[in-house]
């Protein structure tokens, strides 16, 4: 919780619209409209000011209908997306993206944009599938980038980048951590590996872990909430830490892990096996408020102790 609390920007009368975050989510297809919504909605509930969703034309009306808070852009072509990315504070690519091969050139342009402009960047879901399929073309020195694989996505990345064929059968947590460190070094990016214990591994070998109790329900969409919240936290961490991307990735990664695991646990405690991702999202505003209220109480207690 302390990592999360450190990242929350102070709300003051001097803030302007956009100061707390302008975030882009790139994903959404005919089949998958929930994933980009979950990623974007998590960002909205955490307090980002402007959330843009870039999606396939077939997905746009559906995503628009989910929430009036989101700015939805239909069309998945570089000429329309890249100029708008110049205004974004962080980019999340992959939730509900789909695997249409025609998307790969767009992703290559986005990767190059991120590398050159050093924008906080998260690759999740189908974005990771494309990276696995085109590992030899993934750029080096993507210093702002975090990959967020689950175990299946992690196994694909390890097979493509490291030649490891049997990762799904690895049971040892220390061996998985070793593979995550090898993958991070080989790809020169941070790996946020989701699992029973979440790992954040940076290319220099540093490892952070989060084992906060989480939901026992493994419903779809929790990874999208992780990706969205991580994107916003990366921006907030950058504001606090400047270009110290290693520290920013650890602070943001552990904050995202704690948030999603805690919100999921609260939702599961209330709803049991009926818990789903919308119910998890509903817990985020309450969780943020609880953290801020605790901070205010601690501050008042500290001030009182001085007199």
Curated annotation (Swiss-Prot):
Signal peptide positions (record): none
Example GO molecular function: ATP-dependent NAD(P)H-hydrate dehydratase activity
GO biological process, one term: metabolite repair
Co-factor(s): Mg(2+)
Annotated ATP binding sites: 194-198, 214-223
Top EC group: lyase
Residues bound to (6S)-NADPHX: 96, 150-156, 224
Keyword DNA-binding attributed: no
Ranges for domain YjeF C-terminal: 1-291
Domain of life where this protein originates: Eukaryota
Enzymatic reactions: (6S)-NADHX + ATP = ADP + phosphate + NADH + H(+); (6S)-NADPHX + ATP = ADP + phosphate + NADPH + H(+)
UniProt entry keywords in alphabetical sequence: ATP-binding, Lyase, NAD, NADP, Nucleotide-binding, Phosphoprotein
Entry's EC annotation: 4.2.1.93
NAD is among the record's keywords: yes
Record-stated family: Belongs to the NnrD/CARKD family.
Job description of the protein: Catalyzes the dehydration of the S-form of NAD(P)HX at the expense of ATP, which is converted to ADP. Together with NAD(P)HX epimerase, which catalyzes the epimerization of the S- and R-forms, the enzyme allows the repair of both epimers of NAD(P)HX, a damaged form of NAD(P)H that is a result of enzymatic or heat-dependent hydration.
HAMAP family the UniProt entry points to: NADHX_dehydratase
NCBIfam families: yjeF_cterm
Name of the molecule in the record: ATP-dependent (S)-NAD(P)H-hydrate dehydratase
Source species of the chain: Caenorhabditis briggsae
């Amino acid at each position: 919780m302390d990592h999360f609390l450190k990242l929350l920007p102070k709300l003051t009368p001097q803030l302007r619209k956009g100061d707390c975050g302008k975030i882009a989510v790139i994903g959404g297809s005919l089949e998958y409209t929930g994933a980009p919504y979950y990623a974007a909605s998590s960002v909205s509930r955490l307090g980002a000011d402007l959330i843009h969703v870039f999606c396939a034309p077939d997905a746009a009306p559906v995503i628009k209908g989910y929430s009036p808070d989101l700015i939805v852009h239909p069309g998945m072509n570089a000429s329309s997306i890249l100029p708008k990315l110049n205004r974004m504070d962080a980019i999340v690519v992959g939730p509900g993206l789909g695997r249409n091969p025609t998307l790969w050139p767009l992703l290559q342009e986005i990767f190059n944009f991120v590398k050159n402009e050093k924008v906080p960047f998260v690759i999740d879901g189908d974005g990771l599938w494309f990276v696995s399929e085109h590992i030899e073309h993934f750029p080096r020195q993507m210093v702002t980038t975090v990959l967020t694989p689950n175990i299946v996505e992690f196994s694909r990345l390890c097979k493509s980048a490291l030649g490891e064929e049997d990762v799904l059968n690895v049971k040892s947590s220390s061996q998985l951590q070793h593979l995550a460190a090898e993958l991070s070094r080989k790809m020169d990016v941070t790996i946020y590996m989701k699992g029973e214990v979440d790992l954040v591994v940076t290319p220099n070998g540093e490892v952070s872990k989060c084992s906060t109790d989480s939901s026992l329900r493994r419903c779809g969409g929790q990874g999208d909430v992780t990706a969205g919240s991580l994107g916003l936290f990366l921006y907030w961490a950058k504001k606090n830490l400047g270009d110290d991307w290693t520290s920013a990735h650890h602070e943001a990664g552990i904050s995202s892990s704690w948030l999603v695991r805690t919100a999921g646990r609260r939702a599961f405690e209330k709803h049991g096996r009926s818990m789903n991702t919308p119910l998890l999202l509903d817990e985020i505003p309450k969780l943020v408020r609880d953290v801020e209220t605790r901070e205010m109480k601690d501050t008042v207690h500290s001030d009182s102790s001085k007199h």
